[in-house]
Swiss-Prot record:
GO terms for molecular function: glutamyl-tRNA reductase activity; NADP binding. During catalysis, the active site Cys acts as a nucleophile attacking the alpha-carbonyl group of tRNA-bound glutamate with the formation of a thioester intermediate between enzyme and glutamate, and the concomitant release of tRNA(Glu). The thioester intermediate is finally reduced by direct hydride transfer from NADPH, to form the product GSA. This is Glutamyl-tRNA reductase. The record marks 75 as: Important for activity. PANTHER family: GLUTAMYL-TRNA REDUCTASE (PTHR43013:SF1). GO terms for biological process: protoporphyrinogen IX biosynthetic process from glutamate. Disulfide bonds: none annotated. The gene is hemA. Belongs to the glutamyl-tRNA reductase family. Its EC number is 1.2.1.70. Pathway: Porphyrin-containing compound metabolism; protoporphyrin-IX biosynthesis; 5-aminolevulinate from L-glutamyl-tRNA(Glu): step 1/2. The lineage of its organism: Archaea, Methanobacteriati, Methanobacteriota, Methanomada group, Methanococci. The active site is at 39 (nucleophile). It comes from Methanococcus maripaludis (strain DSM 14266 / JCM 13030 / NBRC 101832 / S2 / LL). Possesses an unusual extended V-shaped dimeric structure with each monomer consisting of three distinct domains arranged along a curved 'spinal' alpha-helix. The N-terminal catalytic domain specifically recognizes the glutamate moiety of the substrate. The second domain is the NADPH-binding domain, and the third C-terminal domain is responsible for dimerization. Keywords: NADP, Oxidoreductase, Porphyrin biosynthesis.
Length: 382
């Protein structure tokens, strides 16, 4: 297997957005492949038995990191467990892998090998989350903000406004995905980024000049921009009704003067740090247990793949034998009018054996014993 990947560790989110794969075009060009794309990760998985032209892949994915073989497989198992995520142990990636895999299967773009790898990755991700505590507690400022809002005020059937669609806003979005929220609105100065994030949340994007209307509509407001100036000032929040505002931006998005309004509860990043730091440490302590699961399941996967390889070799060999049998039988049928049956059968059996022996000898002359034992010589001997 080969993986091409680009993620938040190497590129900022605006750059990743420009690197996103056009999946319609991708699946038209390649077979035996699966694309997994999220707001902070772009990855494509290839079965290299089918996609043997690696130069073509490398040219199409300039700027992407490349992983092959064992490294690619281990990487994918870690991804499914949330070990490679912006939020350690996050749950959303497992659902995104399932959705991506299902799409590729519906398009008939997977292979028997990729089916085994993806089903195993999904199983490993499920084990990690049920047998360890890798996904428990809020570990980012973004998820801590959502946890605080839910714990103190409840989010069920609430309207939430997220101001900011950058890195921190994305973390908030990931946490919101798990909640039963009535509606989510995303506002950002760059409307296209708001639109992209809103789509993932199944929410609605608004232009910044419609911020006042969005505030009036919302029950909870989470501010997470990178603006050097206040986004919400006291005069912006006059007569807006009861609001919960959680400001996790640095520098601050909300003027502290809004605390003067009795109908507004304002929380800042300082209220959340202790929550996220403590939970992150708990998750880090679970990493060895998850790695043990990955090691166990990797060994199981390799045995499954070895079985698949043997079955494919036997299938190819049977096809090879059938091809020779058919050709020699055609010759025998042509001779049936001029020779007796015993002579025809004698010639047929000798020709059949000679063809197999000839192909094997021709290939083995210049092949080492080890390579010969590991090769499908009948393919090369044709």
């Amino acid at each position: 297997m080969l993986v091409v990947r680009a993620d938040y560790k190497k590129y900022p989110i605006p750059v990743l957005e420009k690197m996103r794969i056009d999946e319609d075009e991708f699946y038209k060009k390649y077979d035996a492949c699966v694309v997994v794309q999220t707001c902070n990760r772009i990855e494509a998985y290839f079965d290299t038995e089918v996609n043997s032209d690696l130069n073509c892949i490398l040219n199409d994915f300039s700027g992407f990191d490349i992983l092959k073989g064992k490294n690619a497989t281990f990487h994918f198992l870690k991804v499914s467990c949330g070990m490679d995520s912006m939020i350690l142990g996050e749950n959303q990636i497992l659902g995104q892998i399932k959705t991506s895999f299902q799409k590729a299967r519906e398009l008939k773009k997977t292979s028997r090998y990729l089916d085994s790898v993806f089903l195993k990755a999904i199983h490993v991700g499920q084990r990690a989350r049920t047998e360890t505590k890798i996904n428990e507690g809020s570990v980012s400022i973004g998820s801590a903000a959502v946890e605080l809002a839910e714990k103190n005020f409840g989010l069920a059937n609430k309207n939430v406004l997220l101001i900011g669609a950058g890195e921190i806003g994305t973390l908030v979005a990931k946490a919101l995905m798990e909640k039963h929220i009535k509606a989510v609105i995303v506002a950002n100065r760059t409307y296209e980024r708001a639109e992209t994030l809103a789509k993932e949340l199944k929410g609605m994007a608004v232009h910044f000049d419609k911020l006042k209307e969005a505030i009036n509509f919302s029950d909870v407001i989470i501010c997470a921009t990178s603006s050097p100036h206040y986004i919400l000032k006291k005069e912006d929040l006059i007569d807006v009704g009861n609001k919960i505002i959680i400001d996790i931006a640095n520098p601050r998005d909300v003027d502290d003067a809004v605390r003067e309004f009795e109908n507004i509860n304002l929380y800042t990043i300082d209220d959340l740090r202790n929550i996220s730091d403590k939970n992150l440490q708990k998750r880090i302590e679970e990493v060895p247990a998850v790695e043990k699961i990955i090691d166990e399941e990797y060994d199981v996967l390799m045995k499954q793949i070895e079985k698949i390889n043997v079955e494919e070799v036997l299938k190819d060999f049977n096809n090879y034998i059938e091809e020779i049998r058919t050709k020699e039988l055609e010759k025998a049928i042509k001779l049936s009018k001029t020779k007796n049956p015993e002579e025809i059968m004698e010639n047929f059996s000798k020709a059949f054996a000679k063809r197999i022996t000839h192909d094997f000898v021709s290939y083995s002359i210049n092949t080492s014993k080890e390579d010969l034992m590991n090769s499908a010589w009948w393919k090369n001997g044709k």
